[in-house]
Amino acid sequence: YLFFSLLTFFAGSISNFALAPWDNIFVLVLSFPIFFLVLKDIHNDKKIKYKTLSFIFFGNIFLFGYFLLGLLWISSAFDYKEGFAELKLISILGLPFLLCLITSPGWILTAFLWGKGLRGCFALSAGIITGEFLRSHLLSGFPWNLFGHSIGFNDFSMQIGSIFGFHLSGFFVILFALAPVLFLKKNTFIWGITFSLILPIFMLYGYLRLPSEIRYLDKDFLIIQSKISQDKKLNSNEIENIAKKFLELSKTDNKVDLVIWPENAIPIFLSENENIRRMLMLGIENSKNLLVGDLIIKNETDIYNSAVLISEDGRITATYDKVHLVPFGEYLPLSKY
């Protein structure tokens, strides 16, 4: 069990390389067959109770490795200030553990559907996607690092999402990744070929869907990304210097249609300070519009992480609120307690 556990954890961990920034979907062709063979070896227990528990155990080890490495970056939110070491550890280990609990019903489904060869492939894919659907909707929803996101490695491959969405796309991606398993026996060899064609079919659909020539709008955008440390953003005495830095970076010789600043560029509530918005727009001489990230207070308890569009006279003409906040990074779960 120790060897299988380590092997399963390894398979789950390397699956992250199928997502951005690596975008190597073919790593799944290694990780999923490894995981499948582990499940194949433990499914021989005739008692459904013990078989189900084994599937939940190894399935969660696979996903724990996947979540641990894939969501490790969230813990960096606690690095800007001392005294949060305990919370950092909770975010590193607690979040993957919670997500594993939420997705566990998917492994129960896999255990009940499991069978030899082709049936096992469908059972594994169905179980994982069921778990992903649950974690995408239960509680506040956490639809991050879905296996369906791996189709984003290419403009053509991602077009299939327009038909299936990411959950069903993920179902087919896992079947594609399990193709090598079906090559091991003659009676499933043809299914192995069929599963191997899933990704090329995705690519072909994307090629046919995208126009051969892309017509670009005659618009010019200026995107600004500064390098300002978090401790300066937390220092109220640095607000003026930060604003000057962004205004300096926004200077160009040519007029642009839109200047874009990053999330929380100026560490104040821009939506609450019209005079500051006007001053900023006076400093941006080459554009009439500024798109910038801001925190918006809509009532005493709700603060939204939003993108706001500011016109040349300092008015906010449009806003877009972020739907899913980063746990521990943008909000503290169970903060009431």
For the regions a protein language model found, what residue spans apply to each?
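Membrane-embedded alpha-helical bundles of multi-pass enzymes
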Residues: Y1-L210
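Soluble catalytic regions of membrane-associated enzymes that act on cell-envelope
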Residues: G206-L332
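Short, intrinsically disordered, charge-balanced linker/junction segments flanking boundaries
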Residues: L334-Y337
